């Protein structure tokens, strides 16, 4: 993904050929003011919101779950991208003059790809965690240490993927201005550039979204379309409802990301189909709009968490308790009120003529916090009674399908 405009259209400095020295895309002041206000909203909302999300998770033991660690990584990547790239993107797109030097030119083209990779693969890791928790509940879950290793690997791969674009970025001084561009190695038909852009688009957009879509489709079918026969308590329904809320929240997060970034990826694939399109006068406004939509994806997640998750809502209320129109809420519920009430429920499962009584440890709608005790699944010894309930045996299951929940 390029975050600068190619030079050959004087709106996009990505190549070193056909360079125009004049700036044809000068906007009236009122347009610049409107765009500046729109981009300011992104920066403020994203940085503040994502920093609060990080604080809510790291400052409260009950929030330090495997899934939430990935949400911390997602929030960090999005806050950094909003802080370090959004304003620079805007000023360069408006003025088409590079004010920030060679080092930041390289960083400006390098970091967004790394941040996007880290963001989307954090969502992929959450989808995988939900898939394992719901589809394979008796399989071992990631520990806090393993989760941190996964996050580290995600960033290493992200930096490697972004390296070529940062390496080939450079500045060029013209008589009237300085531009930031990417000088790819010379090759017929711009083969290296095309291959890299297509590879990046597949790896940071289409492939992870395909994996996430499959995971949540299977999880959704399991949670919404499957019913376990037999009696079910109110607590059972509460657990299923909690799981559904978590999955629904993450689906909203992923769909928001996909919608926000699709126009931007399409915009940067267009030059390989119709290069003359970038010569049009309106293309600057199209770029500013698609870039605003893409950058705005960094500010929506904190809003989604606050609206769809009770604990995040409590955390946001506490963080902004000084605001006159926000009630503090039950802040103790964020730290002290654990929903991991280990209640033992007896559920009778009737399958044909077999009746088996299972005494199940009902878990919370959250993963285990980092410091909390970890339940280890035991094998199930189901004993059928043949014809008489009096001959049935009772056994305890230390980890059940409905005992792995997310905050």
UniProtKB/Swiss-Prot annotation:
GO terms for cellular component: cell body; cell periphery; cell surface; dendrite; postsynaptic membrane; sperm head; sperm midpiece. The chain crosses the membrane at residues 32-54, 65-86, 107-128, 149-169, 195-219, 249-270, 284-308. GO terms for molecular function: substance P receptor activity. Residues 55-64, 129-148, 220-248, 309-407 are cytoplasmic. Disulfide bonds join 105-180. Residues 376-407 have a biased composition (Polar residues). Glycans are attached at residues 14, 18. Residues 1-20, 362-407 are annotated as: Disordered. It is found in: Cell membrane. Residues 1-31, 87-106, 170-194, 271-283 are extracellular. SUPFAM superfamilies: Family A G protein-coupled receptor-like. A lipid is attached at residue 322 (S-palmitoyl cysteine). GO terms for biological process: aggressive behavior; angiotensin-mediated drinking behavior; associative learning; behavioral response to pain; eating behavior; long-term memory; operant conditioning; positive regulation of action potential. Interacts with ARRB1. Belongs to the G-protein coupled receptor 1 family. This is a receptor for the tachykinin neuropeptide substance P. It is probably associated with G proteins that activate a phosphatidylinositol-calcium second messenger system. The rank order of affinity of this receptor to tachykinins is: substance P > substance K > neuromedin K. This is Substance-P receptor. It comes from Mus musculus. The lineage of its organism: Eukaryota, Metazoa, Chordata, Craniata, Vertebrata. The gene is Tacr1.
